Amino acid sequence: MAKAKFQRTKPHVNIGTIGHVDHGKTTLTAAITKVLHDKFPDLNETKAFDQIDNAPEERQRGITINIAHVEYQTDKRHYAHVDAPGHADYIKNMITGAAQMDGAILVVAATDGPMPQTREHVLLARQVGVPYILVALNKADAVDDEELLELVEMEVRELLAAQEFDEDAPVVRVSALKALEGDAKWVASVEELMNAVDESIPDPVRETDKPFLMPVEDVFTITGRGTVVTGRVERGVINVNEEVEIVGIRPSTTKTTVTGVEMFRKLLDQGQAGDNVGLLLRGVKREDVERGQVVTKPGTTTPHTEFEGQVYILSKDEGGRHTPFFNNYRPQFYFRTTDVTGVVTLPEGTEMVMPGDNTNISVKLIQPVAMDEGLRFAIREGGRTVGAGRVTKIIK
């Protein structure tokens, strides 16, 4: 059968399955691919449980994560779905942003109700900015007592509300295993779940619709034309003759105008999110710009030196530190394209952080960095990655 062409016509949405180990995240992922394949055979491939469970290793910011990616389509949307089988993999994925989610399906076994990892996953989803969560109450075939199902549903709603997620989110009773076996009643439950995903997870804001930002990777001079900065456009669109600001690393912000946009040595009218471009800047000297700064739409990005972050510290086996660190630890924080040294303050009551831990820290950088909440970073010691994190709150 011919492969269905990737149509740009449908909105593309990134989702994932989260929840306690053994509650059926991977089985549900497999069931979704099978049910959608049977419903729309020309749009979807079916993926067996073991294809998803033996998730390939990926490296993100120097950290190895096991994570499975599957794709599928409904009538309305094209989905990229991630499933991190292990608890540690889930935590690492959320913090490093190996796979960002526009929404998540929280899988809770009706037989157990919310468990410690269920809570931890929802908390982490809040901290890393997952916009929406809905619920698959799995293994519902194994619970005959309607009151018990309602009780579990209530507990899950309280858990969502506690982390400021929508407590009226859809909670769909499913049996992933029975759906995989082709049981008509439970196949219908997975179809109902996917309808709920279509309806409840909001369309993501496309990167091109956000204000322009490009991290500077390189700076050079073209004789007779001026200074060019190169990098990959992170978000937004830049047109020739638009004003920009150069932000970060230095104490003051520089204003200038983009007089040319080049890509693959060709002149363009504009560059957009995802493009690797060179920007010609009017009246800017070679020494006025450096790697680590960002070129951005005026007034949309500010430099900061103090922030709070959620971090994952690599274990010794992952190539991380062999020893814990304490208050006033001074590593480098790698933001986008450059390292900046910072001083770490641990949360009250935390004496030290062990390799393999995830925790909140406060950081004071020695140079300002253009940042927003949600920006990701690596923690390095002399170029070696020892951790990864995400800005959860800007202090100054």
Curated annotation (Swiss-Prot):
Highest taxon in the source lineage: Bacteria
Subunit note: Monomer.
Matches recorded under HAMAP family: EF_Tu_B
GO biological process: response to hypoxia; response to iron ion; translational elongation
Chain spans, region G5: 175-177
Organism (species): Mycobacterium tuberculosis (strain ATCC 25618 / H37Rv)
Upper taxonomic lineage: Bacteria, Bacillati, Actinomycetota, Actinomycetes, Mycobacteriales
Region ranges (G1): 19-26
Covalent S-S links between cysteines: none
One Pfam family it belongs to: GTP_EFTU_D3
Region (G4): 138-141
Subcellular location: Cytoplasm
Region spans: G3: 83-86
Binding locations of GTP: 19-26, 83-87, 138-141
UniProt protein name: Elongation factor Tu
PANTHER family tied to this protein: ELONGATION FACTOR TU, MITOCHONDRIAL, ELONGATION FACTOR TU-RELATED
UniProt-annotated binding residues for Mg(2+): 26
